[in-house]
């Protein structure tokens, strides 16, 4: 019987790339996302090689999350790895210019959504025991502040601390917990953040070499497939051409 991974936000970016990476290794896949057409397309692609179960899901909906887990087919119930990938960034403008609804959406998705899924899947991960993993998608924004990050950065700081504290609670169960924290990566993420402004999204990556979704997927897979006695607590990764900025100074 092949190992089983559950990936949220599997319809694009890191989630889709992770689904392909785990499929390459023969894992069975539980894929969730809000866009049914994309889920269907990905399932059709990957089901040629591995077993795939899909569920249209908004992770913000606590009851829907629990229903998806409760209704998993018997062959998909013994989840070994959970990849909490679903998340988004909105409103790159300064905090004082942001629509409050955008802040609420980020909190509901990046924090509450991750908590909803984790809580629902924990019992089966604990039952699986040694070698089971939770991989949370964080961000360098959770560690390093920058203008326009406001609630997005704060939500990813939550992911980091939730990862660490969950790890403490799960000590002795065999379940590992990791925060994978990427820097600049070229995915649909930026297009969503800019409200669909393709020119602004393209400008961010112009004349540099960002991470690709496949780079991050490789790290997700790596942390989940290390020997059972090894836990990567946090894995921060940036493109070689990205580094930290100097402190901002306001001058007269």
From Swiss-Prot:
Residues reported to bind substrate: 139
Top-rank EC class of the record's enzyme: oxidoreductase
Reaction catalysis annotation: 2-hydroxyethane-1-sulfonate + NADP(+) = sulfoacetaldehyde + NADPH + H(+)
Keywords on record: NADP, Oxidoreductase
EC number(s) recorded for this UniProt protein: 1.1.1.313
Catalytic site positions: 152 (proton acceptor)
Record InterPro entries: NAD(P)-bd_dom_sf (IPR036291), Sc_DH/Rdtase_CS (IPR020904), SDR_fam (IPR002347)
Known function: Catalyzes the formation of isethionate from 2-sulfoacetaldehyde in the deaminative pathway of taurine. Constitutively expressed enzyme that only mediates a small part of the activity observed in taurine-grown cells.
Protein's UniProt name: Sulfoacetaldehyde reductase 2
Gene field: isfD2
